Design a protein with these regions (language model features):
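N-terminal "arm"/small-domain region of PLP-dependent enzymes with the aminotransferase-like
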Residues: 1-52, 158
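PLP-dependent aminotransferase class I/II
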Residues: 36, 215-293, 298-300
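Substrate-binding/gating loop at the entrance of the active-site cleft, primarily
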Residues: 80, 101-118, 253
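Active-site phosphate-binding strand-loop segment of PLP-dependent enzymes
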Residues: 121-130, 141-200
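Conserved PLP-binding catalytic core of the aspartate aminotransferase-like
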Residues: 281, 291-326
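PLP-dependent enzyme catalytic core of the Aspartate aminotransferase-like
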Residues: 324-325, 335-368
Length: 368
């Protein structure tokens, strides 16, 4: 069965006829710089704690996050990755008349909403407004916009689920774009899983607004930026009453001891954060330029650590060839109905790895 998410190395290895370790994975949008040394040190230091249950309130991690975001502890809830917290956001959205979802959307949003029988209304991005004149030398800007479909019920009876930066396009919306919806909707859930990739002077987080708007929920992931997908840790920021309701219904000890220790360390790792912010823009730009020069490929500009690419060649076929001939895995977009088989997504990796991808794509597109 084809994977729904990126990072399925077992499937990729079976397709390529090699071991999972031989796969160069561009399908999962994980930073190649991590995990930080601080995470490894924290895990080693807490191995002796495996004999005890975790602190159910995760006070050490929560207190550190409070310092980072200038909030009191009751406004923050650590979770088993942002996916677990998305489930509870889906539970709240399903209580409303409708849940408006900006599409194309991460497949897990549908899971979380359908789990509680939410009525989903899609609001598609206008991807066709992009400048496609690559041949004229005009840079293709990511100016994609969205116009919300009018709900069948009033806005005050409906909820909105959006991510910023947007996955899979990489579009970053200014906070002023989203703020008006906080006055209109009963609930606004903003997934900021990729916001950490932007330095403080560029990020557009709505966390500073959460105390003003009790209908605002922010989801944050520590998976992508800190390269910790195997540990499963993230957190939600929302009104204490809402988070307390979630806590009463979730499983106990959702975050294991080692994940909590690593998370506590990395959010204080200023050196890793700074090096990541310095690394990403030039490396992403080099990959963007390389993709732009390959016939039949049209990348979108991105504020995140990945690039969405439109392809003249069916991407399912391209993915198979990359695996079988080069042991490289890209993320097809078949799980995004609005995109289908003419788009793929690639993570930004090291310059050497990016060059390997570009050479393989050039070979496959020019020889086909």
């Amino acid at each position: 069965m084809r994977p729904v998410h990126g990072g399925n190395l077992a499937w990729a290895a079976a397709t390529a006829g090699c071991s999972p370790d031989a796969i160069l994975d561009f399908s999962a949008s994980i930073s190649p710089l991590g995990p930080p040394k601080s995470a490894i040190a924290a895990i080693s230091a807490h191995l002796g704690s495996l004999r005890a249950y975790p602190d159910p309130d995760y006070r050490e991690l929560t207190n550190v996050l409070c310092q980072v975001h200038q909030l009191s502890p009751e406004w923050i809830l650590p979770g088993n990755g942002s996916a677990e917290l998305l489930t509870w956001a889906g539970w709240d959205l399903a209580k409303l008349a409708e849940a408006i979802l900006v599409t194309p959307a991460f497949g897990d949003y549908y899971r979380a909403l359908k789990a509680f029988d939410a009525k989903i209304i899609k609001s598609p991005l206008d991807l066709e407004s992009e400048d496609r004149s690559q041949e004229t030398g005009v840079r293709r800007e990511n100016n994609s916009s969205f116009i919300l479909q009018p709900p069948s019920f009033s806005f005050f009876e409906s909820g909105l689920l959006i991510n910023n930066p947007h996955n899979p396009t990489g579009k970053l919306w200014q906070r002023e774009t989203i703020l008006p919806y906080l006055e209109q909707f009963a609930l606004v859930v903003v997934d900021e899983a990729f916001m950490d990739f932007l330095p403080p002077e560029r990020e557009q987080s709505l966390i500073p607004m959460v105390q003003k708007y009790p209908n605002l929920v922010i989801l944050r992931s520590l998976t992508k930026f800190y390269s910790l997908p195997g540990l499963r840790v993230g957190y939600a920021i929302a009104h204490p009453d809402r988070l307390q309701r979630w806590k009463q219904r979730r499983d106990p000890w959702c975050v294991n001891t080692l994940a909590a220790a690593a998370a506590t360390a990395v959010v204080q790792d200023l050196e890793f954060q700074k090096s990541s912010w310095e690394w990403l823009p030039p490396t992403r730009e080099q990959l963007f330029q390389g993709l732009s020069q390959i016939p039949g490929l049209h990348p979108f500009e991105s504020a995140a650590n990945f690039l969405l690419v439109e392809s003249a060649q069916p991407t399912q076929e391209l993915q198979q060839k990359l695996l079988q001939q080069h042991q490289i895995l890209i993320r097809d977009c078949l799980s995004f109905p609005e995109l289908g088989d003419r788009y793929f997504r690639v993570a930004v990796r090291s310059n050497t790895e990016n060059e390997r991808l570009l050479k393989a794509l050039w070979q496959l597109t020019t020889m086909s």
